[in-house]
Regions:
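N-terminal catalytic cores of secreted or lumenal carbohydrate-active enzymes
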Residues: 58-202, 207, 215-217, 221-225
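Active-site neighborhood of glycoside hydrolase catalytic domains
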Residues: 183-204, 211-306
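Aromatic/acidic polysaccharide-binding cleft in carbohydrate-active enzymes
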Residues: 300-382, 387-398
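Secretory/extracellular carbohydrate-interaction modules
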Residues: 540-605
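Flexible glycan-contacting loops in extracellular carbohydrate-active proteins
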Residues: 647-676
Length: 687
């Protein structure tokens, strides 16, 4: 009896002829390899003749249901740092379409976990997110400010099983200390407003300050008792959510079993390192033996932070490699990326970061990036509760993580999936053990040319398939069905920010954040003023407990287009204290542009960034009245007006361009009737 010969599968161009003769000569194999390298988007999976002599033994992936393995907890995203700011401003149906790509199961990325920032009113990376309790008095009736609660509700609407989590970056000033009884009450109030206003029950709290560690005694004495006393006993705690002192928390947990019982999972950021973002770098952050032995779930609670618009380099392919690597090497069972979506203005720091892009709500344009489909190669084929098969997780080449594989099974049904990321071209044999589904194998593939393309299904022969895989690709082989490359069709075309622009804030509810305004520090929200109309107020009364150093201008909010140069910016202002300003040609947080400043005692100043260009005092200034500010920028000539009177004109050679902004000290200063209008360029204005 002849031994059984496994079918060899390879990818050939659609319509190409496949010889049935045995391939005996290396030259012939080389020519066939050249043909294979021409594969782009159109190909078939074709079994070659059983007479082929293998060039090398295939890499074996044996799916043994008896293999040890940890429970898969999901692939998630961290909406924080104001990275999601522009998403809620999208019109329908585009806003719902974007949310489908992010959270709808078996449609797009299908994120299975969502962690959001507990806002503070202080900068947390790409801007500031508002707090549910700006003052201690608001603890009694916390406010549903911002968009993170809305985002969690939209995620759960699409996937009732999505795991919800939260974490602060900074704190309002009244908390006093980041690990205090007041801060514990502030955490609890966030859960209360989520429950009261959106009907949300969160699953986890990251009991820490983002990347600043935690205090286990605070968790024991303040946070856990506060949660239990107010009806949140089921909420679990993860710590330390840090990006330093990797895995050292286990030294403390090992010594104190009471503390150990309080921590449901341990999470760290950038376990594989940050810059230079190389998949084979040795950052020295691998999970320790003590961490792995503990049996406690290990999380990569923030990872990647790159642009999903690229396939190679540090983009989607790198992300797929990293997801496989961190389980195989570290036994990390939950992987969360920052951020789910690039929904910030381009020139804000960390713009172009995320799984997809939606940063032009005024026209409804968005882009589904390749990273969505790299994530889908795991999330559409394995649910939380599936179990990894450790013996089937590994490297294709022991010298590099460019090629790897991770295998999982459903303990209830016997379904299985294998996610393979390749570096070089190579051959792989998947052997399916007894007790796992042995029906047809469904194949999905992503390359730079085309992502998430379903391939012809393949039948097992003697429990195995043997495959030749393309380089720099992602494959999923699975017994499951129901996946799809979801699509809502082509979105509207991209357009620049509208000019002229005006907002009188009358179309909002009090407490709303107005469309297209991106707070960078402080909180600007719509409010009613004593005259009965609505306006924009800066509501944070004092600087909070900062995340990192205070590198920013006073509280300010951005809007507009980075290409604006020759234009007027104007607003009505009412000062409660300190000063206010309007500005233009803001390029980034280190290039503030031109600033027209008015103080409550009537002093005015025209600045280029932090340099004073002109200044003076308004006679008989009425601090209790509304005043009209206007900044005119035309070529090199910059002029400032107050109440219709030109107070300064300077000639400045910076030739900068950029966005508009409003700014205020930490006072409840008001803005209304904000307008931006075009001016003819300097040469166009000449007769």
């Amino acid at each position: 009896m002849k031994p059984a010969i496994l079918p060899v599968l390879t990818l050939v161009p659609s319509g190409a002829r496949v010889s049935s003769r045995p391939l005996k000569e290396h030259g012939h194999l080389a020519r066939m390899s050249n043909i294979l390298s021409l594969v782009l988007a159109s190909f078939l999976l074709v079994p070659l003749s059983a007479g082929r002599a293998p060039a090398a033994a295939p890499h074996l992936i044996h799916l043994d249901p008896a293999s040890p393995g940890r429970v898969f907890e999901g692939i998630g995203a961290v909406s924080a740092g104001a990275s999601t700011r522009l998403l809620p401003d999208y019109p329908e149906p585009q806003r719902s379409q974007i949310l489908d790509y992010l959270f709808k199961p078996k449609f797009g990325a299908g994120f299975q976990h969502l962690k959001v920032e507990i806002g503070s009113g202080e900068n947390s990376t790409c801007g500031s997110e508002p707090s549910h309790a700006v003052t201690r008095e608001e603890l009694a009736n916390p406010r549903p400010r911002g968009y993170e609660l809305w985002l969690m509700a939209e995620a759960r609407k699409r996937n009732p099983g999505v795991v919800l989590d939260c974490l602060p970056w900074a704190y309002p000033h009244w908390v006093g200390d980041r690990f205090s009884q007041d801060s514990a009450e502030w955490f609890v109030a966030f859960l209360q407003v989520a429950r009261k206003r959106y009907g949300l029950e969160l699953d986890w709290i990251s009991a820490a300050q983002n990347e600043m560690g935690t205090d286990l005694n605070w968790i024991r004495k303040d946070l856990r008792p506060a949660l239990d006393a107010r009806g949140f006993a089921k909420v679990k705690l993860q710590a330390p959510d840090d990006d330093s002192e990797y895995w050292q928390i286990f030294d403390s947990l090992e010594k104190n079993r009471d503390l150990d019982r309080l921590i449901g999972a341990v999470g760290y950021h950038y376990v594989d390192g940050r810059e230079p973002w190389q998949i084979d770098q040795k950052a020295g952050r691998d999970a320790t033996e003590k961490a792995r032995r503990s049996g406690k779930p290990l999380w990569a609670s923030e990872e990647w932070s790159q642009s999903g618009g690229r396939w190679g380099d540090k983009g989607a392919l790198y992300l797929a490699r990293l997801m496989n690597k961190l389980y195989t090497r570290d036994r990390i069972t939950k992987f969360e990326i920052w951020c789910p979506i690039d929904s910030i203005y381009d020139q804000i720091i960390w713009g172009d970061t995320g799984a997809m892009q939606a940063d032009t709500p005024w026209c409804g344009h968005y882009t589904v990036w390749p990273a969505v489909w790299a994530i889908a190669h795991t999330t559409q084929f394995a649910e939380p509760g599936w179990v990894y098969l450790d013996n089937a997780c590994g490297q294709l080449d022991p010298t590099t993580w460019r090629g790897s594989h991770a295998a999982l099974r459903d303990p209830k049904t016997g379904d299985w999936s294998v996610i393979i990321v390749t570096g070089e071209r190579g051959r792989v044999q998947i052997r399916v053990g007894s007790g796992l589904k042995d029906g047809p194998v469904h194949v999905w593939k992503s390359t730079e040319a085309e992502q998430f393309a379903q391939q012809p299904s393949v039948g097992l022969r003697n429990g195995s398939i043997e495959l030749e895989l393309e380089p720099d690709a992602v494959y999923t082989f699975t017994s499951t069905t129901g996946q799809q490359k979801g699509s809502h069709g082509k979105p509207p075309p991209r357009k620049p920010f509208p000019l002229p622009f005006a907002d009188d804030f009358e179309s909002y509810r009090p407490g709303d954040s107005p469309r297209y305004f991106s707070d960078q520090k402080g909180t600007f929200e719509v409010c009613r003023w004593p005259g009965g109309g609505q306006c924009l107020a800066q509501i944070v009364p004092a600087q909070g407990i900062l995340w990192y150093g205070n590198w920013l201008l006073k509280p300010h909010t951005l809007f507009g287009d980075p290409e604006w140069r020759d234009c007027t910016i104007e607003a009505d202002v009412l000062l409660a204290g300190g000063d206010v300003e309007i500005g233009g040609r803001y390029a980034d947080r280190n290039k503030l542009g031109y600033r027209w400043i008015l103080t409550r005692d009537g002093r005015w100043q025209l600045n280029w960034q932090y340099t004073v260009l002109a200044g003076g005092q308004i006679a008989d200034f009425n601090p209790g009245a509304w005043h009209h500010l206007r900044l005119e920028m035309k070529g090199d000539r910059i002029s400032g007006f107050t109440d219709g009177k030109k107070l300064a004109t300077v000639t400045d050679k910076s030739r900068a361009k950029g966005m508009a902004f409003l700014a205020s000290t930490y006072d409840r200063n008001l803005f209304d009737d904000v307008r931006v209008g075009p001016l003819p360029a300097e040469d166009e204005a000449k007769p």
